[in-house]
């Protein structure tokens, strides 16, 4: 998509090969705001609970994913997968969270970047949270990030919600 996706909710299951996401496969520019996905998502390259990939000037704001993500690894492919976004290379990610587990099957001779929140990250993340089967939130990170695991002790869901709301207010969203 190159457009605007707002206030949507997706359930069920989604499967594919490349650019597989609960809401959108690839968001190239435009924005995704206020969307959620409880869908189970299965794919091979760039796989995520909300978006398989964000790119160019795409923004992701106030979104969340609760469905499980399965990455079926192709031995000859580079792999990026996360509970929220597989490959995050848009212009910003603000106040989003993910709770679905991320699992993978197989092995690859290419890179395998799998995280509890994002597979690959190439942009600024502000107030991003995850809680699932992964200790590492981002498989490969090229930018500073505000991605934090909710552990229930130091970081509770209440603290996470408060921080996401504050970030949205500060951004004027």
Region spans (language model):
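Predominantly extracellular beta-rich ligand-binding scaffolds that present long acidic/polar faces
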Residues: 1-173
